[in-house]
Amino acid sequence: MPFGNTHNKHKLNFKAEEEYPDLSKHNNHMAKALTLEIYKKLRDKETPSGFTLDDVIQTGVDNPGHPFIMTVGCVAGDEESYTVFKDLFDPIIQDRHGGFKPTDKHKTDLNHENLKGGDDLDPNYVLSSRVRTGRSIKGYALPPHCSRGERRAVEKLSVEALNSLTGEFKGKYYPLKSMTEQEQQQLIDDHFLFDKPVSPLLLASGMARDWPDARGIWHNDNKSFLVWVNEEDHLRVISMEKGGNMKEVFRRFCVGLQKIEEIFKKAGHPFMWNEHLGYVLTCPSNLGTGLRGGVHVKLAHLSKHPKFEEILTRLRLQKRGTGGVDTAAVGSVFDVSNADRLGSSEVEQVQLVVDGVKLMVEMEKKLEKGQSIDDMIPAQK
């Protein structure tokens, strides 16, 4: 939980060795990168809004990670965190994002017309398609560190911006605190709303403070374009629909997102972005595009194939269970999405999903007929 600066000064009465966390049983990127030397060097630093090294790492100290799943183990409290604590963040970013170096530049491409295909994924296998990203509003602390006033200001700005959208994007904001339990649960079950903050990662990082104050969901009239306000990021923008038309989902995503960005810019509140990290977000795993383009796809045979994991890796895709992170697949339906966020563009990342899923559906159809797919195994992308 973020503390005031005085608390950090109080800690300096103890030697770095006495304050250094025990990370001996940890499996996360932070624990791998945080040496005693780095801890010594950074522990008395703080960002202009008062975020400290211990605030950055607390979630990773409290959640050692999973023997098979490498979590990130740290968060940013504001835009400056990535600069002030770069000695810790840089190796974590390099490790998490396939060797992305401190000197590398990210690229952005939100021109949906650059996507090839994507309108012909077989709906008998691809049940739904979704693209999401996060955005942070410049000048405000991020959710692990923002005050109640800041969070409410972000909500007010966001609602004003979103309510000015027209046409296919015309919609309405639903604050969490005025929803009944049933309404909330229904939206969660329909995959429209974020879960209640029970995740230890959310809790330990301070993101769940004052819940549900100033949190909510905005969506257009036909629920195909949604914005979450003040969950893990200031904004999470989501375009989704049933079936396999990823081309249309991505078009709506790009157009809606750029409209929102334009409105915020005009109001004097651009999104946090720089040419090294792309869009700046709370979790280092989302830096770059912040984009996750995913489909729910039925792969009853391919998922039992001994090379399933290898095929995903070669296609630069990752799988989750049907309900998202840390859940099991129900009825052989997997949530398959791009593994990369940083160093490649939005179009490139969605292209990998479209091409990879198309290939996997073709493999699935061959396996149904009892045919071999050995000649279809892709090379590493």
Swiss-Prot record:
Residues engaged in binding ATP: 128-132, 191, 236, 292, 320-325, 335
Class of enzymatic activity (EC top level): transferase
Concerning InterPro entries, the annotation shows: ATP-guanido_PTrfase, ATP-guanido_PTrfase_AS, ATP-guanido_PTrfase_cat, ATP-guanido_PTrfase_N, ATP-guanido_PTrfase_N_sf, Gln_synth/guanido_kin_cat_dom
Task: Give all Phosphothreonine modified positions.
Answer: 166, 180, 313, 322
Q: Where does this polypeptide localize?
A: Cytoplasm
Q: Which residues carry this modification: Phosphoserine?
A: 164, 178, 199, 372
Q: What is its main location?
A: cytoplasm
Please report which protein family the annotation says this sequence is part of: Belongs to the ATP:guanido phosphotransferase family.
What is known about its subunit structure? Answer: Dimer of identical or non-identical chains, which can be either B (brain type) or M (muscle type). With MM being the major form in skeletal muscle and myocardium, MB existing in myocardium, and BB existing in many tissues, especially brain.
Give the protein's recorded name.
Answer: Creatine kinase M-type
Organism field: Bos taurus (Bovine)
